[in-house]
């Protein structure tokens, strides 16, 4: 039951579509612009740096907020489960972000929300590794999609390595295995949401990042 509650808490926070709300406030419906995606990259491409920054921070923060709420609910009674429950909350946020019911289940791709999960459940070194990898790949290739998929892959590997070395301070091995399963699910989901990007990357037609206008080839 605790797991389900955490997923539901996360899903509610995930429903806060930062990019969509910011766009509506400024007379732009992200679902009808650019890629039609309600996430950070489309906000950046369609409305510029400010919109991209606001969307990124908002989508990251909602995951951090969900984890904080879960800690408030279960922190004193489920100490050994907290890393696991935090990940369930993060998974719920990603699901809410990707599949918001009030937008006909058409949301973002969950990368910024996953970044919030990385920030709130791992350590500074994993955060820095993911950040540096993302910046390096986007700076050299200008493919945000490639950087995003690299980050979720690094996240999965990091969760397993961190967990196997006692980083989560979880005594129940079954909890660790669940955490690895959640990280695997999030990686697979991210790749699924980027399936069109993967096809374009393989064919050499993927759009390169640009701001406030048309993507460059």
PLM features per residue range, with description:
Residues 1-5, 67-88, 119-126, 161-181:
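Helix-coil boundary and interhelical linker segments in multi-pass alpha-helical membrane proteins
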Residues 1-25:
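N-terminal signal-anchor transmembrane alpha helix
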Residues 10-14, 90-97, 134-138, 159, ...:
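Alpha-helical transmembrane segments of multi-pass membrane proteins
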Residues 20-52, 107, 199-217:
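Cytosolic, membrane-interface loops and tails of multi-pass inner-membrane proteins
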Residues 29-40, 102-115, 143-152:
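Short, non-helical or kinked segments that cap or interrupt transmembrane helices
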Residues 44-49, 70-74, 111-141, 154-163:
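Interfacial segments of multi-pass membrane proteins
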Residues 45-71, 84, 103:
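Multi-pass membrane catalytic core of lipid/isoprenoid biosynthesis enzymes
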């Amino acid at each position: 039951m605790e797991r389900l509650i955490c997923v539901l808490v996360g899903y509610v926070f995930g429903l806060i579509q930062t990019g969509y709300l910011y766009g509506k406030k400024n007379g732009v419906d992200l679902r009808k612009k650019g890629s039609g995606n309600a996430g950070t990259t489309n906000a950046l491409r369609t409305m510029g740096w400010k919109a991209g920054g606001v969307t990124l921070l908002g989508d990251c923060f909602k995951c951090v907020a969900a984890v904080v709420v879960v800690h408030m609910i279960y922190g004193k009674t489920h100490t050994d489960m907290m890393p696991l429950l935090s990940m369930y909350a993060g998974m719920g946020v990603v699901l809410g972000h990707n599949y918001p019911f009030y937008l006909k289940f058409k949301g973002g791709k969950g990368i910024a929300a996953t970044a919030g999960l990385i920030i709130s459940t791992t350590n500074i070194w994993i955060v820095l590794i993911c950040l540096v990898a993302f910046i390096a790949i986007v700076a050299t290739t200008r493919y945000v999609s490639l950087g995003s998929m690299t980050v979720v892959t690094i996240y999965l590997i990091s969760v397993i390595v961190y967990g196997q070395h006692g980083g989560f301070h979880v005594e129940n091995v079954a909890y660790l295995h669940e955490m690895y399963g959640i990280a695997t699910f999030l990686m697979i989901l991210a790749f699924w949401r980027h399936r069109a990007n993967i096809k374009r990357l393989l064919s050499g037609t993927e759009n390169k990042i640009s701001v406030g206008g048309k993507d460059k080839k």
